[in-house]
Amino acid sequence: IRCFITPDVTSQACPDGHVCYTKMWCDNFCGMRGKRVDLGCAATCPTVKPGVDIKCCSTDNCNPFPTRKRS
């Protein structure tokens, strides 16, 4: 499987059986910049703390960097 990996947001090969993930959360600059985003791959979908959004998927490049809605 190929997943996008931060910080470069490049597509990289991950080991067989891994899943891609997109993790998003707010930091002190959330109001100005939007949520922080972490892209990667893991053996299983990571467990996250409250307030952190995680999406996992298992097809090539299924975790692109989310686009921010313009108002």
Swiss-Prot record:
Q: Where in the cell is it found?
A: Secreted
Q: In which tissues is it expressed?
A: Expressed by the venom gland.
Report a single Gene Ontology molecular function: toxin activity
Instruction: Give a yes or no for keyword Nucleotide-binding in this entry.
Output: no
Record-level GO cellular component terms: extracellular region
Q: What is its main location?
A: secreted
Disulfides per UniProt: 3-20, 14-41, 26-30, 45-56, 57-62
Cross-referenced CDD domains, in alphabetical order? TFP_snake_toxin
Q: Which residue spans traverse the membrane? A: none
The record's function comment reads: Binds with high affinity to muscular (alpha-1/CHRNA1) and neuronal (alpha-7/CHRNA7) nicotinic acetylcholine receptor (nAChR) and inhibits acetylcholine from binding to the receptor, thereby impairing neuromuscular and neuronal transmission.
Q: What is this protein called?
A: Long neurotoxin 1
- The species this protein belongs to is Naja haje haje
